[in-house]
Amino acid sequence: MASADRSTLFINATVLDGSEDMEPQPDMAVTVERGVITWMGPSAVAQAPAGAEVIALAGAYLMPGLINMHVHLCGSGKPVSAGDAGALMKKLDNPVGRAIVRHILKGSAQQQLASGVTTVRGAGDPLFADIAVRNAIDAGKYQGPRLVAPGTGVTVPGGHGAGLFAQVANSPAEAAEQVRDLYARGADVIKLFVTGG
């Protein structure tokens, strides 16, 4: 991965540029300076900026980062029953449990990045762990994608995610209070669940 504070020239890449047709463009070069793409063209005419690292991709694909717009970093994708979720949260809502959840979310975020996903929009995670992981990534403690974190979601009684990655709001006033609390905790977006569990 190119460092954000130096220049990198990728050569001999097969570029997928993100355009509508996105036809593979073989034997291309891309210059990145301080994290910004500044030039793209045929490898034969590429000129490396002074001090740039040159990475020969031998025909490997190079493309813009992907964006995953719906992620529960805590989950494996397998269903969890509401009863199991409540029992699990009681076991995890302590310093050791919160550290375990943050570790799981960190691993999931890093797996997203390793898969080419450079931006993740969270869809609700337990114990505000996504906000903690986002803050650690932003502080440079470890690598990860740009994380747009909602904290926990807000759901209706008996709603999706209740007790695991969503707080139950029993009234509009309670929902408004939860939104204010999420904002105060650093949520980037608010995730609402309005369907049943």
Name what the model sees in each region:
Residues 61-136:
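Metal-associated gating/positioning segment near the N- to mid-region
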Residues 7, 105-106, 110, 131, ...:
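Amphipathic, non-transmembrane alpha-helical secondary structure
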Residues 2-3, 15, 19-63:
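Histidine-rich, glycine-flanked metal-binding segment
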Residues 5-11:
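Extreme N-terminal starter segment of soluble prokaryotic enzymes
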Residues 10, 53-55, 148:
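Hydrophobic/aromatic beta-strand patches that form the interior of the parallel beta-sheet core
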Residues 138-197:
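Metal-coordinating catalytic core of metallo-dependent amide/deamination hydrolases
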Residues 3-5, 120:
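Beta-strand-rich domain onsets/edges
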Residues 13, 30, 35, 59, ...:
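Divalent metal-coordination and catalytic microenvironments
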